[in-house]
C-alpha cells in the first residue's frame, strides 16, 4: 500500500485554532474532541487520499479534494491537494455549515 507524506499548512493549522476558539466559546467540552477527531481523520490521507471526493474549487493545473469528517450532527471539511511527490497538503479546514474556506 502506498503511503503519502502529510503536510499540514500554516493556513490549515490556523483554521483548527479558529475552530477550537469558536467551540470553546460555545461548548468547552466539545472543543478538544472535535479537534482530535479532525486530526485523527488526517491519517486516512496518508493511505487513501484518492477515496475522498473532488472539491468544486479548481485552479489551472491543480486538483483539490475534500474529506468529510463527521462530528455530532454535522462535521467538518478538510481541503487538500495530492502533490506529485506523494505528499498530501492539507490546505484548509472548515465546519460544514460555513459558506467557504477562510
Language model regions located:
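Enriched for short, Lys/Arg-rich terminal
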Residues: 69-102
Amino acid at each position: 500500500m502506498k503511503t503519502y507524506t502529510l503536510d499540514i499548512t500554516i493556513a490549515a493549522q490556523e483554521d483548527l485554532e479558529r475552530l477550537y476558539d469558536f467551540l470553546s466559546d460555545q461548548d468547552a467540552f466539545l472543543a478538544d474532541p472535535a479537534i482530535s477527531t479532525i486530526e485523527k481523520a488526517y491519517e486516512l490521507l496518508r493511505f487513501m487520499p484518492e477515496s475522498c471526493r473532488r472539491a468544486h474549487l479548481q485552479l489551472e493545473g491543480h486538483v483539490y479534494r475534500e474529506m468529510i469528517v463527521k462530528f455530532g450532527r454535522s462535521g467538518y471539511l478538510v481541503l487538500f491537494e495530492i502533490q506529485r511527490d506523494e505528499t498530501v497538503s492539507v490546505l484548509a479546514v472548515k465546519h460544514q455549515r460555513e459558506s467557504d474556506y477562510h
